[in-house]
Amino acid sequence: SANPTGPLHVGHGRGAAVGSSLANLMLAAGYDVTREYLINDAGNQMHNLALSVNARYLELFGKEVSFPENGYHGEDIIVTARRIKEKYGDKFLHMEETERLSAFQTLAKDEKLAALREDLEAFNCKFDVWFSEQSLHDAGKIKEAVDTLQKKDYVYEKGGALWFRSTKFGDDKDRVVIRDNGVSTYFAADIAYHQNKFQRGFDRIINLWG
């Protein structure tokens, strides 16, 4: 998977090519294979995408804005803002910022995801399922996964946060699943995603990281 916040880079392409080749080999060997793309469409990176597009959009109307500290500085963000202006004009200028950011996050995500699909198809890398990380949050699957771990005593509280006992499984340190502000981590979402995979009937999962 790659975050739908910008173009694919070489590392993404390498992972996609390796995964696609593995899937093709296993299909040729007679295995039942599902090629799934996890869309990382939740969390801070998506919020930073919305903030970045918001800044570029406002600049197009002559507004003086400070660019977000952790924003995306690529030319593609400017292009996205221009397309939004061309299609919607000044519609979003008159919205509350929260509403405008929500709209920009959706519009930018859809555009970036379409570009990712196009790039992947260009070198014949196909996916059967496009799975949204946000859908796990919306369905309460993150909490469900953490609750499951707590019942098995794999999670403990320290410093107001919830920690997964990953050292029991060979990790060099335990990992936070719920921060002290109550917000789940990407690690918690990954756990929920894998639990969801097994709930959907998969018995073997090959992950391509990076």
Q: What are the roles of these predicted feature ranges?
A:
Residues 1-210:
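NTP-dependent nucleotidyl-transfer catalytic core
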